[in-house]
Amino acid sequence: MEVEILETCKKELRTFPEEILEDFLDAVAKLKDGISLSMPLSRKMPSIGPLVAELRFRDRAGIYRVIYFIKKRDAIYMVHAFSKKTQKTPKKNLDLASKRIRRL
């Protein structure tokens, strides 16, 4: 499966620690190989859309998320990457991911 990382998402990923980026690249490789990911690495996000999920990473410094969208079962788009301090995903991050998905 093809994986596309939006330019805005690439910029956001550059703020992640190196260890988290390595974990992210491992997860992307699995998705490319067609491996279905589940908790705790990936969680569906029906509040944004039926084919939307997030990659979940954590280290001592914080919590990191990358929201992605599966389009027509032949491409995956990484649309938004961010760190957060609380368990709940901030509404502004959900809204931004939703906006980027609508543009695809």
What are these regions (language model features)?
Residues 82:
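Compact, Lys/Arg-rich rRNA/RNP-binding cores from ribosome-related proteins
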Residues 79:
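Conserved catalytic cores of phosphodiester-cleaving nucleases, focusing on short active-site segments
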Residues 1-63, 72-75, 85-104:
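Basic, Lys/Arg-enriched alpha-helical interface segments
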